Amino acid sequence: MRMYQWIVISIIVFLSSHSFAEAKSKITVKVMIVSMFGPEGEVWRSHRVLDRLTVVPGLLPADSAVHCGRDGVCQVTTGMGYANAAASISALIYSRQFDLQKTYWLIAGVAGINPARGTLGTAAWAHYLVDFGLQWELDKRDAPAAWPSGYLGINTMSPAEKPQLIYGTEVFKLNDELVNRAFSLSESVKLTDSPSAQKARAVYGYAPANAAPAVVQCDTLSSDTWFSGTHLTERADVWASELTDHHAVACTSQQEDNATFAVLMRAAGEHLVDTNRVAVLRTGSDFDRAPPGGSDASTLLNYQSAGGFEPAVMNLYLAGNTLVQEIAGHWSAWRRGVPPR
């Protein structure tokens, strides 16, 4: 009997010590910066000391490590598009190599920008993430003539009808307290610009498209399809407003954010992360529609020559680092949640 008790106690002690060692070995993260591809990640690695690398199975083969600093700030590159974003964030969280329960997440990447809401280099903090891809679609040539596009909500009868949100990932609302604080910390930051971006925006002839880049608050649309042009983007603007009962004001478009947040939401259900600690910053690298009298096809096909990419990448850091530094530098105030002002 005594031998049996000794064995049981030994097993319990072993398992307890193993669990303690596992918990102790986890890397505690104060801020996780989420980038989608190389240049978005490099701007952080070149301006912050993120020299502690942890390889995570399941991340991008070409960028398979999470880069961390001694101050609790880390950066991961997911890869572009929904599949890469979801796969990488899942791999990161479920690797159990990091303690992410109190982590603040900064999803920061370049995006298309609506010239009526911003310009090349604009840094936009989002309150809403809206999935543009979860719709029915007919080729416009096959749709009723009265429809403004071939898009309509799933299981609806017209483009003007709001659908039931049956997928659960159509719209995500971020924590207003965090978004507003991020904006207030960064709104006075002087953003960078370029001569080629100034030339590209001048042809729009109206503000804010032809003005200098600034930090703003407006919402973002996700879609695996890189959509562009007046008709599609007008539909996207309406769609964002429709799904949020006219609260969202869309200004940027990108290919990952709803997928990334969906993974975080699932993990939050297991108490692994806190979705009230997620901020999304998107910077305008290209216009999503043509200037008056211009060609939508030309705007899309020649987006790389507009000169917005370099300022957009740099402005991710300039605007986003204000939040990162505030959290990491005042962790005792932020650890329990967004502190009162």
Predicted regions and their residues:
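Positively charged n-region of N-terminal signal peptides that target proteins for export
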Residues: 1-5
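Sec-dependent N-terminal signal peptides
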Residues: 6-14
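C-terminal segment of classical bacterial N-terminal signal peptides
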Residues: 14-21
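Accessory terminal and edge-of-domain segments that mediate assembly/interaction
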Residues: 22-341
